[in-house]
């Protein structure tokens, strides 16, 4: 018999998962560096606009705002913190650094495999997990650290601050490489020495915030829409993080806090949220606090328990004090009794309510600069809905038909700051309300008419969120037009330009509130609607008076 050569067959099983083992440390600032080679950027697997220094520790994006995707040259261990310093930040672009992990080996990627953006291009593929750093945290010399644990949860912290949970469901059965997209205002980043993340106790896990930054642009929106399953997992596991029980729910607890200084002292606190609500929003036991923990918001519509009364101001607090507010508030008025609705019928986007037969009017109540702001919405007897922010009048937001019962509703923006608190209501005894009496200000405020401001600054799809009547209606004489009697001319001024005389009737609703020039321009807009009753405009007809 001849000699037999024994060959070792190549192991086709996936490589063993790297797990960073370390002694237990008590609380404190002490950190221990990870043994072994510090991570560097992969020299070949990078976007076409990325330039690396000689040590592959510093990545700089040249030209444009994209094509800045990079990876680490080696897998990252579990609990190993990927630490980045933001070396250069350039204002002017929209969006900031994207970061996360991938289960795909960058060494096997070709230049064609690396797209312009990590979000949404990469995260829509299996095996990629990344999200955006909020722009308000993307400051020069900021140190970002992020890591994955053995449960597939990903946390990040800024400047050694408290951990923020921003992903669940990451596959940790195989190697994970760090994914870093030098995007937007972030021009240059530097990889620092890795350290171990402290093991989070159940108490600290309960305090770990859920990441939520509002998508400011179309590419950012993919951070919240690209991986619905993972976002659901985040919410599903929050109770487990906080309480150590897989079946625990995330409570929405109304804690006593001082009333915002800008809100009136004599608010009536009898009004609560209606029990009918979207499936992705929870209410406190007293139904005065609505919480939406999901970063993407989801279906979070909430309604007032009863219809608003003419002359009544509804006061709410948006977000959490000290945290950036999630986004602009979506506020609306409807003639539909919430008790007749099923939670499954409530959409994520209030615009979808356009298909219903009831009377629905929706507006965006402007950007909220910070969490804890107090907003008031005043329904005047004539149909005007006035907005005030922290006691400052912002003008008219809507004009509605007060001949029927009208409930208020909100879409609660999701995330760590995603909550809406009912502060109470204030009833005015007079039809003409003052800023101090109504908490909403005068219609003559310098911020002008919010209804038209929203329409002019928003896209066509947002400018006229109102349902058409289910059956043809005869032209009504609306109280919303007659109550705030215009001044300056016999026929009144156009409610758009406030210059020309009203000489046009809107078909089919019959309202007269426009000059002919503004009427023609308004009719040419997509989904044009009457400024008073918000019904669709089919035509505008000029009238002649003797």
Curated annotation (Swiss-Prot):
Catalysed reactions, semicolon-separated: S-ubiquitinyl-[E2 ubiquitin-conjugating enzyme]-L-cysteine + [acceptor protein]-L-lysine = [E2 ubiquitin-conjugating enzyme]-L-cysteine + N(6)-ubiquitinyl-[acceptor protein]-L-lysine
InterPro entries: B30.2/SPRY_sf, Neuralized, NHR_dom, Znf_RING, Znf_RING/FYVE/PHD
Subcellular location: Cytoplasm
E.C. number: 2.3.2.27
Pathway in which the depicted protein is active: Protein modification; protein ubiquitination
PROSITE patterns membership: NHR, ZF_RING_2
Ranges for domain NHR: 38-194, 270-424
Coiled-coil residue windows: none
Phosphothreonine: modified positions: 199
UniProt enzyme class: transferase
SUPFAM superfamilies the UniProt entry points to: RING/U-box (SSF57850)
Keywords on record: Cytoplasm, Metal-binding, Notch signaling pathway, Phosphoprotein, Repeat, Transferase, Ubl conjugation pathway, Zinc, Zinc-finger
Sample GO molecular function, one term: ubiquitin protein ligase activity
Main location per the UniProt record: cytoplasm
Cystine pairs: none
Oligomeric form and interacting partners: Interacts with DLL1 and DLL4.
PANTHER family xref list: E3 UBIQUITIN-PROTEIN LIGASE NEURL1B (PTHR12429:SF10), NEURALIZED (PTHR12429)
Protein's name in the database: E3 ubiquitin-protein ligase NEURL1B
Organism for this UniProt entry: Mus musculus
Lineage: Eukaryota, Metazoa, Chordata, Craniata, Vertebrata
């Amino acid at each position: 018999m001849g000699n037999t050569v024994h060959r070792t067959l190549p192991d086709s099983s996936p490589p063993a998962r790297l797990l960073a083992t370390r002694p237990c440390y008590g609380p404190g600032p002490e950190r221990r560096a990870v043994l072994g080679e510090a991570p560097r950027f992969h020299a070949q697997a990078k976007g076409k606009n990325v330039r690396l220094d000689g040590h592959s520790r510093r990545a700089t994006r040249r030209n444009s705002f994209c094509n800045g995707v990079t990876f680490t040259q080696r897998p990252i261990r579990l609990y190993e913190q990927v630490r980045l310093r933001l070396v250069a930040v350039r204002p002017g672009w929209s969006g900031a650094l994207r970061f996360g992990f991938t289960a795909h080996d960058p060494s096997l990627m070709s230049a064609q495999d690396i797209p312009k953006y990590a979000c949404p291009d990469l995260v829509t593929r299996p095996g990629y997990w990344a999200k955006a750093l909020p722009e308000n945290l993307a400051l020069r010399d900021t140190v970002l650290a992020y890591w994955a644990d053995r449960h597939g949860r990903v946390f990040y912290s800024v400047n050694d601050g408290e951990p923020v949970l921003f992903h669940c469901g990451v596959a940790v059965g195989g190697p994970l490489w760090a994914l870093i997209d030098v995007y937007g205002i972030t021009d240059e980043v530097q990889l620092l020495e890795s350290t171990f993340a402290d093991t989070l106790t159940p108490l600290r896990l309960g305090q770990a915030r859920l990441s939520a930054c509002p998508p400011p642009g179309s590419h950012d929106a993919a951070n919240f829409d690209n991986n619905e399953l993972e976002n659901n997992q985040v919410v599903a596991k929050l109770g487990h993080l906080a309480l150590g029980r897989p079946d625990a729910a995330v409570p929405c607890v109304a804690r006593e806090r001082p009333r915002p200084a800008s809100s009136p002292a004599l608010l009536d606190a009898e009004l609560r949220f209606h029990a009918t609500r979207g499936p992705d929003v929870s209410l406190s036991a007293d139904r005065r606090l609505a919480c939406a923990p999901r970063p993407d918001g989801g279906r979070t519509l909430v309604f007032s328990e009863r219809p608003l009364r003419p002359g009544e101001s509804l006061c709410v607090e948006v977000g959490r004090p000290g945290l950036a507010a999630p986004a602009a508030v979506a506020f609306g008025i409807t003639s539909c009794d919430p008790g007749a609705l099923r939670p499954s019928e409530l959409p994520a986007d209030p615009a979808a309510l356009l298909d219903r037969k009831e009377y629905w009017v929706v507006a965006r109540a402007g950007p909220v600069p910070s969490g804890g702001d107090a907003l008031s919405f005043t329904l005047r007897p004539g149909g005007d809905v006035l907005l005030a922010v922290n006691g400052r009048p912002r003008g008219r937001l809507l004009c509605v038909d007060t001949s029927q019962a009208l409930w208020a509703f909100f879409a609660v923006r999701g995330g760590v700051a995603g909550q809406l608190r009912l502060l109470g209501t204030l009833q005015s005894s007079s039809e003409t309300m003052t800023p101090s009496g109504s908490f909403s200000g005068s219609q003559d405020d310098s911020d002008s008419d919010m209804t038209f401001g929203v329409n002019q600054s928003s896209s066509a799809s947002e400018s006229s969120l109102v349902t058409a009547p289910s059956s043809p209606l005869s032209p009504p004489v609306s109280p919303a037009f007659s109550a705030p009697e215009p001044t300056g001319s016999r026929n009144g001024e156009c409610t758009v330009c406030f210059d020309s005389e009203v000489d046009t009737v809107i078909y089919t609703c019959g309202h007269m509130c426009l000059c002919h020039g503004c009427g023609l321009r308004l009719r040419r807009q997509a989904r044009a609607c009457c400024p008073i009753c918000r019904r669709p405009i089919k035509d505008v007809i000029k009238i002649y008076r003797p």
